[in-house]
Amino acid sequence: TVTISGGTITEASGGYMAAGIGSGYQGLGTVTIEGDAVIKNAQGGEAGAGIGSGTYGDSNILIRGNAVIENAESSANGAGIGSGQGDLYLDGDGMVIDPTVGNVTIEGNAKIENAKSGYGGSGIGGGAIGIGNVIIRGNAQIGNATGGEEGAGIGGGALGTRDVTIE
């Protein structure tokens, strides 16, 4: 579990399959960014989220208060903000889908600018083969959420499903 309640973090980078801020490979937990926290340039490694989970990791992300996030990015298959990449493989009986699971809630006066992913991931939501929900409410502001090829700006990544609610 990671909680950031204030201050400024710049240049947080995850290695291969890890998030820039959050969990590593197969990590579980919650990432909360709140208060007057400012995050600039959170970069996930390939298949990891910029902010959220690494590959095969499940996490919930809560961004609230007056938090500001600028430039959260996954190089490929993870979300800019959300889950990393899940798995798809052959078993003796057929295809097995093992998704990452994560929910993203953005609320209060939180502001996000430039959340993006490379191939397969979403800007905000799921990585490739990821499931969960995105909830945006209150006075939250989002500018420039960009998914990679086969990924949504806000929603699911490739082969993933997401419910998006704006309240």
What are these regions (language model features)?
Residues 1-14, 21-43, 51-73, 81-116, ...:
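Surface-exposed loop/turn motifs in large extracellular/passenger domains
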Residues 17, 47, 77, 120, ...:
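Beta-rich catalytic cores
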